């Protein structure tokens, strides 16, 4: 890969994503400007607070460029709030809340409750070899509806969807970057390289 992977660095746990990419030998840059975005071979939208992320993207004049780049085919991976930002529909968003879109899914924010209801679990993840993926759910969203073009990558034991892919877009409800899990980032890098 000649160009680095950009990590949206307006808010959230972007540093942890950069550390994970570094651990697998992939160069990354923090995306805060349009110039940063244009240097990126792919984009990671980290966990954080989706409403704040939207406001900051607008304030930094990045909202429309991000929306347009994703729509034009920039490989993009969203975790937790990043999944919310990639969803075409946010079921319980605050008035005026919208994401960049791209994934034909409907998501519900904070579907598992508040910070105190956070949990970790091991789960299967399509496209990842080896053992189960160790996943941390922190005020996580859930995918409640998937469109015809959506590939479900992961579910909880009760069937709730926590990982999806549509073409070169991937979104997950959980945080692999905080558990030391690198295989999902490796999968995303393979999507960027494809």
Where are these regions (language model features)?
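N-terminal beta1-alpha1 cap of cysteine-dependent amidohydrolase-like domains
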Residues: 1-59, 63-71, 182-194
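Cofactor-binding loop segments of dinucleotide-utilizing enzymes, especially the Rossmann-like FAD-
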Residues: 10, 81, 174
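Short, well-ordered secondary-structure micro-motifs
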Residues: 18, 87-89, 147-148
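Hydrophobic anchor at the start of a short beta-strand
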Residues: 28-29, 76, 169
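General beta-strand structural signal in soluble alpha/beta enzymes
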Residues: 30, 78-79, 164
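Redox-cofactor binding/interface segments in oxidoreductases and associated redox assembly factors
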Residues: 45, 78, 172
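Amide-donor transfer/coupling interface in amidating biosynthetic enzymes
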Residues: 109-194
């Amino acid at each position: 890969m000649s160009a680095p992977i950009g990590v949206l660095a307006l808010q959230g746990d972007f540093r942890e994503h950069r550390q994970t990419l570094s651990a697998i030998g992939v160069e990354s840059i923090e995306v805060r400007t349009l110039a940063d975005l244009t240097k990126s071979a792919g984009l990671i939208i980290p966990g954080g607070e989706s409403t704040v992320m939207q406001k900051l993207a607008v304030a930094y004049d990045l909202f429309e460029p991000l929306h347009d780049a994703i729509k034009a085919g920039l490989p993009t991976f969203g975790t937790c709030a990043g999944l919310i930002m990639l969803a075409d529909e946010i079921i319980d968003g605050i008035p005026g809340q919208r994401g960049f879109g791209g994934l034909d899914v409907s998501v519900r924010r904070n579907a598992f409750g508040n910070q105190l209801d956070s949990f970790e679990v091991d789960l299967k993840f399509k496209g990842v070899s080896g053992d189960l993926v160790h996943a941390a759910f922190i005020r996580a969203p859930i995918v409640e509806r998937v469109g015809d073009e959506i590939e479900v990558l992961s579910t909880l034991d009760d069937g709730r969807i926590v990982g999806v892919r549509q073409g070169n877009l991937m979104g997950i409800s959980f945080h692999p970057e905080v558990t030391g899990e690198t295989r999902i980032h490796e999968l995303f890098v393979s999507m960027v390289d494809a």
